[in-house]
Amino acid sequence: MTFRAQMLDTLTSQSSRDLEAQALGLVPIVVETSGRGERSYDIYSRLLKERIVFLVGEVNDQTANLVVAQMLFLESENPDKDISFYINSPGGSVSAGMAIYDTMQFIKPDVSTLCMGLAASMGAFLLAAGAKGKRFALPNSRVMIHQPLGGARGQASDIEIQAREILYLKERLNHLLAHHTGQPVERIARDTDRDNFMSGDDAQAYGLVDQVAHKRP
């Protein structure tokens, strides 16, 4: 078995397990027939062959590792061909989301992002982090930005350490979001003070996406 086949088998198996758990086991299987016989894929792994990566559900270490692995694999396959990153996520862990973000900026292929359903919190941040001119939202999708959430427990000194960290993350995320949207940092800070929901058109006007996609071009 070639390295490519081994890598695809590994990603297929892992993505199948993760996405089946998210969808309560209701993941369609695609069967392809060739001269060498039949081969089955879960639908997400089949779409991976078309360079489509999904972020579905919460952003956590498990989903981030899966997304990062798929992006690195697709870069190794063809560093000059775009990757399509479809997002339907309420957000989640900042550190897990930053692992995806840094990978998007690190790899050679442009990453085109598309919001379907909801891109909230870290999901919205990753949506905005796509390649300029290649960030899309579907007409009835929703986008929500806000400041990072956190809860501090323990001794007073521990709470102080955690408070400094979340304030650092808030400032860092605000500056990165300002970079990707073209908005002043001061406006980002003001607009993310509370949950801020937007339509696709609002997200386009704000600079989170470049276009509301009604039909495939």
Swiss-Prot record:
EC number: 3.4.21.92
Gene Ontology CC: cytoplasm; endopeptidase Clp complex
InterPro entries, A to Z: ClpP, ClpP/crotonase-like_dom_sf, ClpP/TepA, ClpP_His_AS, ClpP_Ser_AS
A GO MF term: ATP-dependent peptidase activity
Localisation per UniProt entry: Cytoplasm
Subunit structure: Fourteen ClpP subunits assemble into 2 heptameric rings which stack back to back to give a disk-like structure with a central cavity, resembling the structure of eukaryotic proteasomes.
UniProt protein name: ATP-dependent Clp protease proteolytic subunit 2
Provenance organism: Paraburkholderia xenovorans (strain LB400)
Underlying gene: clpP2
